[in-house]
C-alpha cells in the first residue's frame, strides 16, 4: 500500500509525547564476544537502562539487509527497553555524493537528494527510488517504525573543523552572522544540503508514521541551529521560493543535543583580575551546564517563533552527555562527581521537560591505567572488550544508575509536589509519585566548591506535606540493600543525592459514619470524571471538600440533600494523576473517601 504525501510540517503540529522519561545509553561496540542482545541484557538488567541510542546507517543496512536488526530490537523490547533513538544517514560508496566542495574532501552526504522526493508509485514505492536518501529512509522506517521513536538525522552534523562554531554573534567568522564553508563541518557539504536531509526525512517518515519524531541530529552549537532555522533547503543560498517554501525549522519535531561540560566551557569563566580562569568543577555546575545548553538552543528556537505561540515548540532529548570518572589536565573528573552528576542530571531533565537522556556510554573503552582522555573514563560498566558476558562489572556510576532506576521504576515525576517542597536555593531535588500513592523524593545539598563534592545542608519537609518519618536510601542501595529512617523535619544532606520514601498523611482517615446516609464513589479509579452517590431518606446539608495527598484543596461544594439517591459529578480530567480524598461532612459527622485519578 502506497503512503500518501503529507500536507503539514512542524510549523503546524508536533505530536504529543505520552511515554515516560527514559534513561538511555549509547551502547557502542565492545568486541565480537558482545552482541547487541548481550549488551541489552546487561544494560537493562544490571544498569537500569530503558532505551538505546542505536545507529541504522544505509551502508550497513544495504550490506546486511534492511531487517538485520529486527531480532535485536525485539529483544530490546523483551527486556523492557522501548522508545529508542536511531541516528541515521551515512550512505554506501555507490550512493555517496561525488562532489568535492573543497580540496581533498568528498561530500559525506547522499547523491541525488535534489531529485524529486515522490514519484507517485512509479517504481512500486511512493518515493522516487532514484533519490537514494528518500528510498533508504522509506525502507528503514517501514521496517523499524514499531521500535524507534526518535529518528535523529545524522550524528553531530555541526562537528566543527574551523573553530568558529562556538563563537557568539559579532565575533569574526561566527555562524550566526555567516554561512560556514562546506568543509568547516563534518558533513563536508553546504548547510542547505543538510536541511534537504531534514526535509526528506520529515516528509518520508511522517508519511509512514505521523506520530514518530524527527530530530535534528545531536547538535553541539546553537549557531548551527540558527543556520538551519534561517535557511531553506534551496541549494541557491537557502532562499525561500515556491519549490523551497520553508526554512529548516519546519522539518523537525525534536531538538536533540550533546553536552560534555568538562570540555565545553561550562565549568570555567575568565577572570581579568587574575588573568586566568575561575573553575567550577563539581557535579551541580556540570548539571547546570547541561541545562544551560538547553536554554541556549531554546533561545534560538524562540527567536524563530517555535514557542507554542507562532509555531509549536520542539520536544527535547539529549543523546550524548557525561563527565569523566578520571580527571585529565585541567578538566573535571572523579568517580564521586560522575555518579552524582548522573542522578542530578536525570532530575534536571525531568524538571525541564527533556524526554530522554542517552548517556555516553555503556562501558569504558580502556582500563583506568590506559586511559588518556576523559572519554576513556565514561561508562556504566568497566571495560568489556577483555572479558566475556557474565564477567562484567559496574562502575560506581553504573551502580548509581541501577539504584536510580530501581527506586523510580514505577514512579512519575510530580511537578506540583516538587513545587510544594519549597526547596531553598542550596538544596536540589524533585518529587516522584509511586504507583501505590507514596512518594520518593530525591534531594541533595548543592555543591559549590571547585573540584569538591563535599558540602553539607539541612532540609525540613514543609508542615503542609504532613510527613513524619522517611526511608533514606543512598546511591549504592541496589548493591547494599541498606536504608535508615530519618525525621522529615531533620534531613541532613550532602552533595550525593539520596532517595527518601514516605507517605504523606494528609487527612485523618478515621471515619465517623453518617448514620442516615450511604456514600459511594464510582468509577474508582477514574480517568476523567467520577461520581459521588449520596443515598438517604432524610434532608441534610453536606459540605464536600476534595484534597490531594498534601492536603491542598482542589474543589469544594455545599449540597442540600432532600432525600432519595442523588449523584454528584466531579470533572477530574485536569487533575494530576494520583490519589485524592473526598471529605463529606454533615451535622452527623465526617466520612473520608479515597479516589484515584489515573
Label each PLM-derived region with a short phrase.
Residues 5-141, 145, 152-153, 158-187, ...:
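N-terminal substrate-binding region of glycoside hydrolase catalytic domains
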Residues 191-339, 352:
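Noncatalytic carbohydrate-binding groove/subsite architecture in carbohydrate-active enzymes
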Residues 513-598:
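C-terminal outer-membrane/trafficking sorting elements
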Residues 460-479:
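Solvent-exposed beta-hairpin/edge-strand motifs
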Residues 420-466:
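Carbohydrate-binding surface patches
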Residues 481-507, 578:
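C-terminal beta-strand-rich structural cap/linker in extracellular carbohydrate-active enzymes
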Residues 325-402, 416-422:
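Aromatic/acidic polysaccharide-binding cleft in carbohydrate-active enzymes
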Residues 110-158, 163, 185-208, 224-254, ...:
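An active-site-proximal structural segment forming one wall of the substrate-binding cleft
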Amino acid at each position: 500500500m502506497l503512503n500518501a504525501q503529507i500536507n503539514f510540517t512542524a510549523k503546524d503540529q508536533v505530536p504529543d509525547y505520552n511515554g515516560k522519561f527514559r534513561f538511555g545509553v549509547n551502547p557502542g561496540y565492545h568486541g565480537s564476544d558482545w552482541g547487541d542482545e548481550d549488551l541489552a541484557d546487561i544494560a537493562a538488567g544490571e544498569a537500569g537502562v530503558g532505551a538505546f541510542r542505536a545507529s541504522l546507517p544505509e551502508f550497513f543496512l544495504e550490506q546486511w539487509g534492511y531487517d538485520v536488526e529486527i531480532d535485536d530490537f525485539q529483544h530490546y523490547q523483551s527486556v523492557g527497553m522501548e522508545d529508542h533513538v536511531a541516528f541515521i544517514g551515512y550512505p554506501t560508496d555507490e550512493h555517496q555524493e561525488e562532489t568535492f566542495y573543497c580540496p581533498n574532501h568528498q561530500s559525506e552526504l547522499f547523491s541525488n537528494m535534489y531529485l524529486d522526493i515522490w514519484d507517485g508509485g512509479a517504481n512500486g514505492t511512493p518515493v522516487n527510488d532514484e533519490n537514494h536518501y528518500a528510498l533508504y529512509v522509506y525502507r528503514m522506517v517501514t521496517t523499524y517504525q514499531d521500535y524507534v521513536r526518535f529518528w535523529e538525522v545524522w550524528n553531530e552534523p555541526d562537528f566543527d573543523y574551523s573553530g568558529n562554531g562556538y563563537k557568539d554573534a559579532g565575533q569574526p567568522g561566527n555562524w550566526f552572522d555567516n554561512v560556514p564553508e562546506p568543509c568547516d563541518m563534518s558533513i563536508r557539504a553546504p548547510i542547505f544540503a543538510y536541511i534537504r536531509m531534514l526535509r526528506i526525512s520529515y516528509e518520508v517518515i511522517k508519511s509512514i508514521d505521523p506520530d514518530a519524531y524527527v530530530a535534528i541530529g545531536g547538535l553541539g552549537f546553537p549557531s548551527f541551529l540558527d543556520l538551519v532555522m534561517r535557511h531553506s533547503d534551496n541549494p541557491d543560498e537557502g532562499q525561500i521560493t515556491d519549490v523551497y517554501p520553508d526554512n529548516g525549522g519546519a522539518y523537525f519535531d525534536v531538538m536533540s543535543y550533546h553536552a560534555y561540560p568538562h570540555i565545553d566551557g561550562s565549568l570555567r569563566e575568565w577572570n581579568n583580575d587574575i588573568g586566568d580562569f575561575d573553575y567550577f568543577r563539581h557535579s551541580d555546575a556540570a548539571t547546570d551546564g547541561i541545562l544551560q545548553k538547553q536554554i541556549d538552543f531554546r533561545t534560538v528556537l524562540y527567536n524563530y517563533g517555535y514557542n507554542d505561540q507562532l509555531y509549536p515548540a520542539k520536544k527535547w532529548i539529549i543523546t550524548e552527555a557525561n563527565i569523566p570518572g578520571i580527571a585529565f589536565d585541567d578538566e573535571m573528573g572523579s568517580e564521586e562527581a560522575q555518579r552524582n552528576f548522573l542522578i542530578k542530571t536525570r532530575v534536571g531533565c525531568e524538571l525541564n521537560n527533556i524526554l530522554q537522556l542517552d548517556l555516553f556510554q555503556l562501558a569504558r573503552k580502556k582500563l583506568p591505567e590506559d586511559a588518556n582522555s576523559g572519554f576513556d573514563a565514561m561508562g556504566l560498566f568497566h571495560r568489556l572488550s577483555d572479558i566475556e558476558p557474565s564477567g562484567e562489572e559496574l562502575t560506581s556510576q553504573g551502580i548509581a544508575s541501577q539504584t536510580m532506576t530501581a527506586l523510580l521504576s514505577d514512579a512519575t515525576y510530580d511537578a506540583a509536589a516538587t513545587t510544594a517542597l519549597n526547596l531553598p536555593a542550596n538544596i536540589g531535588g524533585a518529587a516522584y509519585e509511586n504507583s501505590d500513592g507514596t512518594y520518593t523524593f530525591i534531594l541533595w545539598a548543592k555543591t559549590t566548591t571547585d573540584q569538591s563534592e563535599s558540602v553539607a545542608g539541612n532540609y525540613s519537609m514543609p508542615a503542609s506535606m504532613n510527613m513524619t518519618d522517611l526511608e533514606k536510601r543512598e546511591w549504592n542501595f541496589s548493591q547494599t540493600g541498606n536504608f535508615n529512617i530519618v525525621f522529615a523535619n531533620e534531613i541532613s544532606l550532602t552533595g550525593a543525592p539520596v532517595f527518601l520514601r514516605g507517605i504523606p498523611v494528609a487527612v485523618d482517615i478515621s471515619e465517623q459514619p453518617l448514620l442516615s446516609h450511604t456514600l459511594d464513589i464510582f468509577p474508582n479509579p477514574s480517568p476523567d470524571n467520577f461520581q459521588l452517590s449520596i443515598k438517604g431518606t432524610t434532608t441534610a446539608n453536606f459540605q464536600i471538600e476534595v484534597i490531594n495527598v498534601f492536603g491542598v484543596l482542589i474543589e469544594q461544594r455545599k449540597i442540600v440533600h432532600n432525600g432519595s439517591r442523588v449523584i454528584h459529578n466531579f470533572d477530574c480530567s485536569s487533575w494530576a494523576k494520583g490519589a485524592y480524598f473526598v471529605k463529606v461532612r454533615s451535622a452527623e459527622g465526617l466520612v473520608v473517601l479515597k479516589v484515584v485519578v489515573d
